[in-house]
Amino acid sequence: MSITIILIFSILSFLLGIILSYVKYIFPIKKNSIIAEVDDLLPQSQCAQCGYSGCYPYAKAIVKNNENIDKCIPGGNNLKFKIAKVLNIKNIKYSLDNLNAKNEKNIHTTVLIDEKNCVGCSKCASFCPVDAIIGTPNFMHTVLQKFCTGCNICLLHCPTNCIKIIKE
């Protein structure tokens, strides 16, 4: 009795899977190619420094709501020019609040972990969206400055407040 029920549900699941995959090709979800192109340019760090929950919502806001293209701090000025090229924007205004436009450089951040207070819980490393924090549990962790975007997410999850961010 139980084998027949399992067999019936297995066959039913298989048939529904085939139907769903067939429906996917008949009614494809059409994505805006411009949004996808802008999203591909963004660094995908999901750091939320732009005020959006991730890179795709920010790309969607840029294309649909004419959001400023200079809010992505990890992307820097080069990203701003690439997005402007995709959107055919001719006059780009520099935003000195978010980017260091005069030197064509990103605002650099240095993240320091205090060795005395770090307990090696690895919470900062597990929440880092760009994997810039390395270390093993119960030992001191370190930050790879080259990859750190300064998003402050590690600060929120550190139980001992041993992480300091210095913006230069």
Curated annotation (Swiss-Prot):
Nuclease keyword on record: no
Family matches, as PROSITE patterns: 4FE4S, 4FE4S_FER_1, 4FE4S_FER_2
Top-level class of the enzyme under EC nomenclature: translocase
Gene3D superfamilies xrefs: 3.30.70.20, Electron transport complex subunit B, putative Fe-S cluster
Residues annotated for [4Fe-4S] cluster 2 binding in this entry: C118, C121, C124, C158
Positions of transmembrane segments: none
Residues binding [4Fe-4S] cluster 1: C47, C50, C55, C72
Boundaries of every 4Fe-4S ferredoxin-type domain copy: 109-138, 139-168
Cofactor(s) required for function per UniProt: [4Fe-4S] cluster
Binding residue positions for [4Fe-4S] cluster 3: C128, C148, C151, C154
Domain of life: Bacteria
Family indicated by similarity: Belongs to the 4Fe4S bacterial-type ferredoxin family. RnfB subfamily.
Start and end residues of each stretch annotated as Hydrophobic: 1-24
Keywords in alphabetical order: 4Fe-4S, Cell inner membrane, Cell membrane, Electron transport, Iron, Iron-sulfur, Membrane, Metal-binding, Repeat, Translocase, Transport
Protein name: Ion-translocating oxidoreductase complex subunit B
Organism: Buchnera aphidicola subsp. Schizaphis graminum (strain Sg)
4Fe-4S domain ranges (all copies): 30-89
GO molecular function per UniProt: 4 iron, 4 sulfur cluster binding; electron transfer activity; metal ion binding
NCBIfam families assigned to the protein according to its UniProt record, in alphabetical order: rnfB
Keyword Electron transport: yes
Pfam families from the UniProt entry: Fer4_21, FeS
